[in-house]
């Protein structure tokens, strides 16, 4: 019986302290979500910048590959034209 009364007393104290805490919230606890929002925005901005940099690097690599392919195609076409002209000259 004494143990159960002690337990009931603990529960009453617990709920009483919870009620006081809810009625008077800690100002620092309220400031934490507000401080976390700029971090999320800066993280999103950093991720966007990294994505843009990656996309720019991929575009530059693609352009360089296309330029190499175009130069190779032009060289092959010139060689084929020269071979055709030489064969036509031989008759």
UniProtKB/Swiss-Prot annotation:
Superkingdom of the organism of origin: Eukaryota
Molecular functions per Gene Ontology: antifreeze activity
Cellular localization per UniProt: Secreted
A cellular component term, taken from the record's GO annotations: extracellular region
Subcellular location, principal: secreted
Region forming the signal peptide: 1-21
Presence of the UniProt keyword Repeat in the record: yes
Task performed by this protein: Contributes to protect fish blood from freezing at subzero sea water temperatures. Lowers the blood freezing point. Binds to nascent ice crystals and prevents further growth.
Similarity field: Belongs to the type-I AFP family.
Protein name per the record: Ice-structuring protein 2A7
Naturally occurring in which organism (per UniProt): Pseudopleuronectes americanus (Winter flounder)
């Amino acid at each position: 019986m004494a143990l159960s009364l002690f337990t009931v007393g603990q529960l009453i104290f617990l709920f009483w302290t919870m009620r006081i805490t809810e009625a008077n919230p800690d100002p620092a606890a309220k400031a934490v979500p507000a401080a976390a929002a700029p971090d999320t925005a800066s993280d999103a901005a950093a991720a966007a910048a990294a994505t843009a940099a990656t996309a720019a690097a991929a575009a530059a690599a693609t352009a360089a590959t296309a330029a190499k392919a175009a130069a190779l195609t032009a060289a092959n076409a010139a060689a084929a034209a020269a071979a055709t002209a030489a064969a036509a000259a031989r008759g």
